[in-house]
Amino acid sequence: MYQLGLREFGENRDQEAVAKVDKLPKDIKWHFQGGIQSNKLKSIATWASCIHSVDQLKYAQIISDQNIAVAKPIFIQLSLDEPPESRGGVDPAKLFDLASSIEKLPGISLQGLMAVAPLTSPLNDSFARLRAIHDQFKAVYKNAIYLSAGMSGDYEMAISYGATHLRIGSSILGNR
């Protein structure tokens, strides 16, 4: 993929990324897209150019505390599940409060939202809801223009609803 000109890659496990980052070309921008564990976040902040799955203020605070020379781009993970937050992500009703708190932290640049389509709702409805929330979010947070949504099974629909970042690892690498 690198030979084809791609320079941005995602990883959802810290240990796997750490093993790759030092061995692969330095011009690669790594995105962390997996579930965050507090004990791994300091490591993730050292190699990830962007962290997509921040869903709690304490995680943003840990990133902020790393005193990184350049603000670390992050996305807030939004829950589209019912009940909210059952599979990770912040409840949409709490999104703006969380973003307001994160925005005040030094060393963080709020770039957008990330979401995983719920298992129980029609995809069209979920992506339409996500787009509407993202549109409202961008109206308040002008730099939060990116939308990380869509995986191997639904990325085409996610693109049609405004996704700018996709997570299609299993289509490329196969299932784990």
Task: Show where each model-derived region lies.
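Conserved, well-ordered active-site substructure
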Residues: 165
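Expand to "…catalyze enediolate/carbanion chemistry for C-C bond making/breaking, isomerization
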Residues: 159-160, 168, 172-176
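Conserved alpha/beta-domain cores
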Residues: 1-153, 161, 173
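Glycine-centered loop/turn positions within well-structured domains
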Residues: 156
